[in-house]
């Protein structure tokens, strides 16, 4: 239970028609009486002057008072909606801070108090920040679905299923003399398999939700004059990179951020890779490799007029040897307008091969679809939810625990070990909603929020 009262501007800094100052805590009513000269009717909008310490009006606007627990934070809350000039907002906040017991809110503290007072769970609290930071319409819709509890509901359903299964398994352990062998009657295995399937579905949705939030990093790499910068320009839809016939034109990393059907895509053009004595070009090549090694996918650009090869190892074995195994590689044969080769995508020795013309944009639509498919993107995200990297990690750990539980059940018929793995899976899932989270984790999450949220 908090004893202090916090205040902050809830709207973004800067000039605007309306600015909102939010107060939350036990002294909210006292603030209202001092600043407004009266106590507004609860949950009714009243148009009132906001007064300074001498009783002179600082501003005038709408005052809204909410009583605990019927507020965003679950505490007494006062919201003052005035004119959105930065000077006016600052004067109003400073006036409120003169009142005893008031202090400035930390970043995310209003949402943190809402979480601590069970007004929303941790995934919903994170969805507030994701909604504010959404970079596309689909990302905003998915964040709203998370805020409304869609993601949390799926997690809670999994936790409840695990709880019921744990009860059944532990009952079998506690009553070993019963005539029925509970662990071998098929119910435990059937329920466990159903939970694992349900978890896999949620993991798939969460991966797409994380994709909408974070996007994927695609690095265009290859030898000089393969058409890397031309592809960057074609994907970006503008002349972002300088394109010439001179090898080594691109000497530094160029970045473009675009959206493909709502999916954030971070495209990085790099210097052509080759042996060179040019010090500046060498630095560019070192930076290129640094980006390649952190990519989600590499587009390996090949000048189709110089070779008919499609196997990257045949084209450049040293490049393939240095590329980290975890990074996906797509071969992009450029200048198909000159070679006249078939544009149909193909699979060659485990690598996708696309034929395009970065100059005329032949085959570019197929490459765009490939990039979306690489991250498991699906066109229909209307019912999706937003997810973060920590959510994916928690889901992955829960899945690993259930795989161990499955082995303990099928191979060893070890009820105690099955129950323990189910408990660990529950803990991992509960981290997502905050039912089982360390103070350090909560601090990191809420400190990343805006002040006033």
Curated annotation (Swiss-Prot):
The residues the record assigns to binding GTP are 225-230, 244-250, 269-272, 334-337
Domain of life per record:
Bacteria
Where is the TrmE-type G domain positioned along the sequence? 215-376
Q: Gene3D superfamilies from the entry?
A: P-loop containing nucleotide triphosphate hydrolases (3.40.50.300), Probable tRNA modification gtpase trme, domain 1 (3.30.1360.120), tRNA modification GTPase MnmE domain 2 (1.20.120.430)
- List locations, semicolon-separated: Cytoplasm
Give the co-factor note: Binds 1 potassium ion per subunit.
Residue positions annotated to bind (6S)-5-formyl-5,6,7,8-tetrahydrofolate are: 22, 79, 119, 453
GO MF assignments: GTP binding; GTPase activity; metal ion binding
- A Gene Ontology CC term for this entry? cytosol
Cofactors per UniProt? Answer: K(+)
**Which Cys pairs are S-S linked?**
none
Give the enzyme's EC designation. Answer: 3.6.-.-
Entries under SUPFAM superfamilies matching the protein:
P-loop containing nucleoside triphosphate hydrolases (SSF52540), TrmE connector domain (SSF116878)
Q: Which NCBIfam families match?
A: mnmE_trmE_thdF (TIGR00450), PRK05291.1-3 (NF003661), small_GTP (TIGR00231)
Question: Its quaternary structure?
Answer: Homodimer. Heterotetramer of two MnmE and two MnmG subunits.
**Its family?**
Belongs to the TRAFAC class TrmE-Era-EngA-EngB-Septin-like GTPase superfamily. TrmE GTPase family.
Q: Protein name, please?
A: tRNA modification GTPase MnmE
């Amino acid at each position: 239970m908090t004893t202090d009262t916090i205040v902050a501007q809830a709207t973004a800094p800067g000039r605007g028609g309306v600015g909102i100052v939010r107060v939350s805590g036990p002294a909210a009513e006292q603030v209202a009486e001092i600043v407004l000269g009266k106590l507004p009717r609860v949950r009714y909008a009243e148009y009132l002057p906001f007064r300074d310490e001498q009783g002179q009006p600082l501003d005038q606007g709408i005052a809204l008072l909410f009583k605990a627990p019927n507020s965003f934070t679950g505490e007494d809350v006062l919201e003052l909606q005035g004119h959105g000039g930065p000077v006016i907002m600052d004067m109003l906040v400073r006036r409120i801070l003169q009142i005893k017991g008031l202090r400035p809110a930390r970043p995310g503290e209003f949402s943190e108090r809402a979480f601590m007072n069970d007004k929303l769970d941790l995934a919903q609290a994170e969805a507030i920040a994701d909604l504010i930071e959404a970079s596309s319409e689909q990302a905003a819709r998915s964040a709203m679905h998370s805020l409304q509890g869609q993601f949390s509901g799926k997690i809670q359903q999994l936790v409840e299923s695990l709880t019921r299964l744990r009860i059944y398994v532990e009952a079998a352990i506690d009553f070993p003399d019963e005539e029925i062998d509970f662990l071998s009657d098929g119910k435990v295995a059937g329920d466990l398999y159903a939970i694992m399937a349900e978890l896999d579905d949620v993991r798939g949705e969460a991966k797409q939700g994380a994709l909408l939030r974070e996007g994927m990093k695609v690095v265009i790499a290859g030898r000089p004059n393969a058409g890397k910068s031309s592809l960057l320009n074609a994907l970006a839809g503008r002349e972002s990179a300088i394109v010439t016939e001179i090898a080594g034109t691109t000497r530094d990393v160029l970045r473009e951020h675009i959206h493909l059907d709502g999916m954030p895509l971070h495209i990085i053009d790099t210097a052509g890779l080759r042996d060179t004595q040019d010090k500046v070009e060498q630095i560019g090549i070192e930076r290129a490799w640094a980006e390649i090694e952190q990519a989600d996918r590499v587009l390996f650009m090949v000048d189709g007029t110089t070779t008919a090869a499609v196997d990257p190892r045949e084209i450049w074995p040293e490049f393939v040897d240095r590329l980290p195994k975890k990074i996906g590689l797509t071969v992009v044969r450029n200048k198909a307008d000159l070679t006249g080769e078939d544009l149909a995508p193909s699979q060659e020795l485990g690598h996708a091969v696309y034929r395009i013309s970065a100059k005329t944009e032949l085959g570019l639509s197929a490459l765009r679809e490939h990039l979306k498919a690489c991250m498991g993107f699906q066109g229909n995200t209307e019912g999706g939810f937003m997810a973060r990297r920590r959510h994916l990690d928690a889901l992955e750990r829960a899945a690993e625990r259930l795989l161990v539980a499955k082995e303990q059940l099928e191979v060893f018929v070890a009820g105690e070990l099955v129950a323990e793995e189910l408990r660990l899976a529950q803990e991992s899932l509960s981290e997502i909603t905050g039912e089982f989270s360390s103070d350090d984790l909560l601090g990191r999450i809420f400190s990343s929020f805006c002040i006033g949220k």
